[in-house]
């Protein structure tokens, strides 16, 4: 029964000290940027009813959810996604729209073993609800680019795709559901040979404009030249409108001076089926995992109430932290500047002194040791160079200079302070 008590479950890990601080800083900087741009915060429970994720289109595989029972025998899951719970809130609370919201929290998804993916990750994101025009997508992309800039993330790119274009092709060629799943993997992985064989085996007419577009889809990535090529092969107004939307977003972001951060990939297809239009994925050259994902989902909120258009982007905090650790100097944990050693009957004065020194910009901690020599040893081990002893009616300040020497007695060198 104790076989696994010293181990973590597959796909999880512990975060210690400096890394915890860095995760917290990334979350807070993202949150601050989003709030400054007018987003309002929403929090949803870590656990949700299974039914929240089990509507008809099944956007998340059942096998990827962590499931258990509540006290009444109902199936509960650890949330595998942040957007669907937010859709539940918007659909059931009848919030006034348009609405810009931001969130941050852990999501849990059971990935296959040995994939290198974590089953618990931190996501911070934004959603714009109630707006179906291109301004919503533009606002989302600007918000994320600016947040990544403030985090000093280097060499990132946000790719813009269009799942509606792919859906139009599938519909026009009458490709069945099971075949579509196979086709999707070929396009996403840019497996040109397998895609060509698929077209041959399905006996699709290679002279047909839609088939030509399908075969070229995995190759349609880059800048605006990609759009021009796709427009030539678009065989319906719906396809042309889908392509035009990507073009409008790209041009708007480029005019703002952010063109170096974006690219187009019309062969990108999100694995979550609730997306209905423009989709996004962000990458950093140094790491293989995506750091940003999202898109337009105009039909999702209707599963919980009124049908409302919406678009959103999620930032993968863990991947941002990994990138920052690789791109920048190792994160240095802020050391304690001063440690206060105190007699137990002087606790109140010691705490008052700690608060005063902290207001002066110092990082100050109370010693946990009753013996002054133990405090000295701990201070040396943790590179703390100043110890203040609060005893009887006075203060004694010690500074390390190859040994502990009295710097001042009666008050500290930082602030004037007398015990009373």
Curated annotation (Swiss-Prot):
What GO cellular component term, any one, is given? cytoplasm
Main location class: cytoplasm
Q: Which GO terms describe its biological process?
A: histidyl-tRNA aminoacylation; L-histidine biosynthetic process
Q: In which pathway does it act?
A: Amino-acid biosynthesis; L-histidine biosynthesis; L-histidine from 5-phospho-alpha-D-ribose 1-diphosphate: step 1/9
Cytoplasm in keyword set: yes
Q: Which InterPro entries does the entry link to? A: aa-tRNA-synth_II, aa-tRNA-synth_II/BPL/LPL, HisRS-like_core, HisRS/HisZ, HisZ
Cystine bridges:
none
Q: Where in the cell is it found?
A: Cytoplasm
Which purpose does this protein serve, as stated in its record? Required for the first step of histidine biosynthesis. May allow the feedback regulation of ATP phosphoribosyltransferase activity by histidine.
What is the name listed in the Swiss-Prot or TrEMBL entry for this protein?
Answer: ATP phosphoribosyltransferase regulatory subunit
- What is the protein's species of origin? Bacillus cereus (strain AH187)
């Amino acid at each position: 029964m104790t076989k696994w008590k010293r181990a973590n479950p597959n796909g999880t890990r512990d975060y210690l000290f400096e890394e915890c601080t860095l995760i917290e800083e990334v979350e807070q900087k993202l949150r601050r940027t989003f709030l400054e741009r007018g987003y309002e915060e929403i929090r949803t429970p870590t656990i949700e009813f299974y039914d929240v994720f089990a509507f008809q289109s099944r956007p998340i595989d059942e096998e990827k959810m962590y499931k258990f029972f509540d006290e009444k025998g109902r199936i509960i899951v650890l949330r595998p996604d942040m957007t669907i719970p937010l859709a539940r809130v918007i659909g059931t609370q009848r919030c006034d729209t348009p609405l810009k919201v931001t969130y941050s929290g852990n999501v849990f998804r059971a990935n296959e073993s040995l994939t290198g993916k974590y089953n618990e990750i931190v996501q911070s994101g934004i959603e714009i609800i109630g707006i179906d025009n291109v301004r919503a997508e533009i606002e989302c992309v600007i918000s994320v680019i600016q947040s990544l800039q403030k985090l000093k993330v280097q060499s990132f790119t946000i790719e813009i795709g269009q799942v509606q274009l792919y859906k139009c092709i599938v519909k026009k060629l009458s490709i069945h559901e099971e075949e579509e799943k196979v086709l999707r993997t070929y396009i996403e992985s840019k497996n040109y040979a397998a895609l060509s064989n698929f077209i041959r085996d399905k006996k699709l007419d290679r002279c047909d404009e839609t088939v030509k577009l399908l075969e070229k889809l995995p190759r349609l990535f880059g800048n605006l030249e990609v759009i021009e090529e796709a427009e030539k092969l678009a065989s319906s107004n719906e396809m042309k409108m889908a392509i035009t939307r990507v073009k409008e977003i790209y041009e708007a972001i480029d005019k703002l001076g952010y063109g170096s951060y974006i690219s187009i990939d019309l062969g990108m297809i999100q694995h979550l089926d609730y997306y209905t239009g423009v989709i996004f994925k962000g990458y950093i050259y140094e790491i293989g995992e995506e750091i940003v994902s999202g898109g337009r989902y105009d039909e999702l909120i209707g599963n919980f109430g009124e049908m409302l258009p919406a678009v959103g982007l999620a930032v993968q905090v863990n991947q941002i932290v990994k990138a920052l650790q690789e791109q920048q100097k190792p994160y240095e944990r802020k050391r304690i500047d001063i440690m206060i050693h105190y007699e137990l009957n002087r606790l109140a004065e010691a705490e008052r002194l700690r608060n005063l020194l902290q207001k002066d910009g110092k990082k100050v901690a109370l010693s946990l040791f009753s013996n002054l020599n133990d405090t000295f040893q701990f201070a040396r081990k943790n590179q703390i160079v100043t110890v203040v002893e609060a005893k009887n009616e006075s203060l004694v300040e010690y500074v390390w200079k190859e040994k502990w020497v009295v710097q001042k007695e009666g008050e500290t060198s930082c602030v004037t302070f007398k015990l009373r």
